[in-house]
Amino acid sequence: MSGGLSVLGLKDDDVRRFLTAKTHIGTAQLDFQMQQYCFKRRSDGVYLIDLKKTWEKLLLAARAIVAIENPAEVCAISSRPYGQRAVLKFASFTGATPIAGRFTPGTFTNQIQAAFREPRLLVVCDPREDHQPVTEASYVNIPVIAFCNTDACLRYVDVAIPCNNKAQHSIGLMWWMLTREVLRMRGSIIREIPWDTMVDLFFYRDPEEAEKEEQTQVVPERSIKEAPEFPPDQWGVGDTAAVQPEVADWSTAAEIPFQSAPAPAPAPAPATDDWASTGTATVGPTTEWGAATDNSWAS
């Protein structure tokens, strides 16, 4: 398919990316419809995928996506966690409609529900995991593009892109390459200039690891203004002396009127007379506690 034009040929950089992400490594099972896309079988029983056919099918899928006038009518689906971030990035760059996560049954067939949609093209991450949207697409005649491994069933799949769809780096790389080819065919980016978007943006990231990376980020310390240095003979001068508050004269401060407390009453003088003595008093008739009077009742 791409053999006629050298511009559309598979470049060495793309082959290096395929090999690094292990896109060519399949599974130990082989479906009879995927046999045409396999290159050979290793000694351990794992089938290897022909990367040239992978590239040709990738270009065919990009042409089918570009042929849709309204980009929102292209639906990208991934129920696997490894492909959800790549699907969202693909939709943000191409304008497609993403469905990341669980697919609601009846989205393409049940017109009563609020999530009903009528896309013109469907792109799925794995026909095994996303069997529900693929089956519903066959009911309403929606063409399906799928990333297929060696054990995938091609029933109801119109364009199969052979690749390793079980590795997180491989599936992220395939979505990145599909996005790049769509933008190139639309004329959004130039084919001769490398795309400035890194492929790492399409890779899956564990939420726990992302939180740990955010927590381990070093917070930049605030710059502290250094105080000016003075020689020993000038200690005490400078900003420190200027900041000292002015001391007021407490003797000249205004007196606050206040009410003085009343003086305490003088204590009574102690008694000087002897209680036991029977002497004569100087002030009046002497009376003792035990003395009898003239009209004494005891006489």
Swiss-Prot record:
Q: Where are the disulfide bridges? A: none
Query: What does the record list as coiled-coil region(s)?
Result: none
Keyword Flavoprotein part of the UniProt annotation? no
Keywords, alphabetical: Cytoplasm, Ribonucleoprotein, Ribosomal protein
User: What family is this?
Assistant: Belongs to the universal ribosomal protein uS2 family.
**Protein name, please?**
Small ribosomal subunit protein uS2
Give a GO cellular-component term.
Answer: cytosolic small ribosomal subunit
- Name the job this protein performs: Required for the assembly and/or stability of the 40S ribosomal subunit. Required for the processing of the 20S rRNA-precursor to mature 18S rRNA in a late step of the maturation of 40S ribosomal subunits.
Q: Which NCBIfam families match?
A: uS2_euk_arch (TIGR01012)
